[in-house]
């Protein structure tokens, strides 16, 4: 079995947890690759994604996502990313020889639409609240449920 782990940055808490999983799997002789958009740690596991979008496009995406996040709901004060734009990275995944894709923290890496285009089995570790809120990474909620606030 060959597993692809996808994470935004290897320095985060999710990235550190991902590395522990990979180290455990490698001890069991399971082939794993760890692809990140931003590589900070000096290790033998994480490799930078070959991400071919021009810098200008990336900057426009970031600006649009920031503006959209501010306009979407001003009552939300936590870190947000709507991930409206994907990366076409799913094409690499679909054309690869990986048997399984493990998504970790994919902010800005894949959109929900991109995830739906992956034709490999997916395991998704919910390292934050984004997969089920659609925009927030974390919200302390202060004992008030999202659905009671009706902010979706």
Task: Give each language-model segment a name.
Residues 1-152:
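Catalytic cores of nucleotide-sugar-dependent glycosyltransferases that transfer UDP/GDP/TDP-activated
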């Amino acid at each position: 079995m060959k597993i692809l782990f996808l994470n935004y940055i290897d320095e985060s808490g999710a990235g550190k947890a991902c590395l522990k999983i990979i180290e455990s799997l490698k001890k069991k002789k399971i082939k794993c690759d760890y692809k990140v958009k931003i590589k900070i740690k000096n290790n033998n596991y994480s490799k930078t994604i070959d991400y071919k979008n021009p810098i200008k496009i990336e900057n426009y995406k970031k600006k649009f996502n920031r503006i959209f996040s501010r306009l979407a709901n001003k009552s939300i004060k936590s870190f947000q990313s709507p991930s409206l734009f994907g990366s076409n990275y799913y094409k690499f995944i679909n054309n690869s020889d990986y048997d399984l894709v493990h998504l970790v923290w994919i902010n800005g890496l894949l959109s929900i639409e991109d995830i739906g285009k992956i034709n490999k089995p997916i395991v998704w570790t919910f390292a934050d609240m984004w997969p089920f809120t659609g925009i927030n990474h974390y919200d302390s909620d202060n004992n008030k449920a999202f659905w009671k606030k009706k902010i979706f």
